[in-house]
């Protein structure tokens, strides 16, 4: 979870979360990618969007796979089409799930800007990893 305040006091932590601006809340809506997607895309986590397919890891709907139908920035919750229950009237109610309790198994890649951002992040990670591998202890570097 991103750091919104340096205080360890619960009241200040709660206030920082409830008063957080939308661009900070977007970072709170980040979920990890599946191992296959991590290898394929070269990144570990990404903010959840409508249309992504997720696997629920915790709670009553554990093991359920479905598409994200809604992302609630105010409550920092996502709604998955397969995580719902029926009211006595027959109306379906979607259950709110925290994004940290899901793993993204399939990305919605219809947005070109999102794909470009993923590529940019992957290239930056590869460049950073390449810099680390330049001098190793076996090559005469200090350990």
Curated annotation (Swiss-Prot):
Coiled coil region boundaries: none
Compositionally biased residues, Basic residues: 11-21
One MF annotation (Gene Ontology) recorded for this entry: structural constituent of ribosome
> Where are its TM segments located?
none
Keywords for the protein's UniProt record, in alphabetical order:
Ribonucleoprotein, Ribosomal protein, RNA-binding, rRNA-binding
Q: Where is region (Disordered) located?
A: 1-21
Q: Which GO terms describe its cellular component?
A: large ribosomal subunit
Give the GO biological process terms. translation
User: InterPro entries this protein is in?
Assistant: KOW, Rib_uL2_dom2, Ribosomal_uL24_CS, Ribosomal_uL24_euk/arc, Ribosomal_uL24_KOW, Translation_prot_SH3-like_sf
Q: Where is the composition biased (Polar residues)?
A: 1-10
Record Pfam families: KOW, Ribosomal_L26
Query: What is the documented function of this protein?
Result: One of two assembly initiator proteins, it binds directly to the 5'-end of the 23S rRNA, where it nucleates assembly of the 50S subunit. Located at the polypeptide exit tunnel on the outside of the subunit.
Q: Please report which protein family the annotation says this sequence is part of.
A: Belongs to the universal ribosomal protein uL24 family.
* NCBIfam families from the UniProt entry: rplX_A_E
Q: PANTHER family recorded for this chain?
A: 60S RIBOSOMAL PROTEIN L26 FAMILY MEMBER
Matching HAMAP family, A to Z? Ribosomal_uL24_A
Assembly information from the UniProt record = Part of the 50S ribosomal subunit.
Q: What is this protein called?
A: Large ribosomal subunit protein uL24
Q: Output the lineage of the source organism.
A: Archaea, Thermoproteota, Thermoprotei, Thermoproteales, Thermoproteaceae
């Amino acid at each position: 979870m991103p750091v919104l305040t340096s205080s360890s006091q619960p009241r200040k932590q709660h206030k920082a979360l409830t008063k957080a601006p939308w661009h900070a809340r977007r970072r709170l809506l980040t979920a990890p990618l599946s191992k296959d997607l991590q290898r394929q895309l070269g990144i570990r986590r990404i903010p959840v969007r409508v249309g992504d397919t997720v696997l629920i890891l915790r709670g009553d709907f554990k093991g359920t796979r479905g598409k994200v139908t809604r992302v609630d920035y105010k409550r920092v919750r996502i709604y998955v089409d397969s995580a719902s229950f029926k009211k006595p009237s027959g109306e379906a109610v979607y259950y709110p799930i925290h994004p940290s309790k899901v793993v993204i198994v399939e990305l919605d890649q219809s947005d070109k800007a999102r794909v470009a951002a993923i590529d940019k992040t992957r290239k930056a990670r590869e460049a950073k990893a390449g810099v680390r591998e330049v001098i190793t202890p076996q090559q005469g570097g200090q350990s």
